[in-house]
């Protein structure tokens, strides 16, 4: 009789243990696909004159690496007038998205204005995460003087 009670308790114990373990398992793996990222840049000049080009060295720093993550770049210029291009020569149009295929790249901003200029650069991944960085340039004053007065 004791053996039958022991066997019954053992079976109930095993079934209880299985009851706790089985709900924790499911067939689908929980794979993280979207990771945080940041756009880092080297210091950029603060003054620019019309026709001058400023180099912006950029680096995309990712918290993780998912193979199917794609990044795009776009920019908007709320102040001033100028052009922005990639180091491979591609000239960007404001608010158009361009695929970003490298983590290290350079942007070149060429001033076409004598006013204060601001550009907002946006990097977005295919999961909807966005990083924005603003670059502001003041007009570089050109000193004109008459050398005959010296």
Language-model features: where?
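First exposed extracellular module after export/assembly in secreted or surface-exposed proteins
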Residues: 2, 33-150
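Bacterial Sec-dependent N-terminal signal peptides
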Residues: 2-7, 17-42
């Amino acid at each position: 009789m004791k053996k039958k009670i022991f066997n019954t308790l053992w079976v109930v114990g095993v079934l209880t243990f299985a009851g706790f373990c089985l709900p924790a398992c499911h067939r689908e793996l929980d794979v993280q696909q979207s990771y945080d990222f940041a756009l880092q840049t080297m210091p950029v000049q603060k003054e620019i004159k019309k026709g001058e080009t400023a180099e912006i060295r950029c680096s995309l720093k990712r918290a993780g690496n998912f193979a199917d993550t794609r990044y795009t770049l776009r920019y908007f210029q709320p102040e001033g007038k100028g052009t922005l291009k990639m180091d491979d020569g591609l000239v960007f149009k404001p608010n158009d998205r361009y695929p970003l295929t490298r983590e290290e790249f350079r942007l070149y901003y060429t001033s076409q204005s004598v006013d204060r200029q601001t550009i907002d650069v946006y990097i977005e991944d295919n999961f909807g995460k966005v990083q924005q960085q603003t670059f502001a340039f003041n007009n570089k004053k050109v000193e004109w003087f008459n050398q005959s007065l010296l």
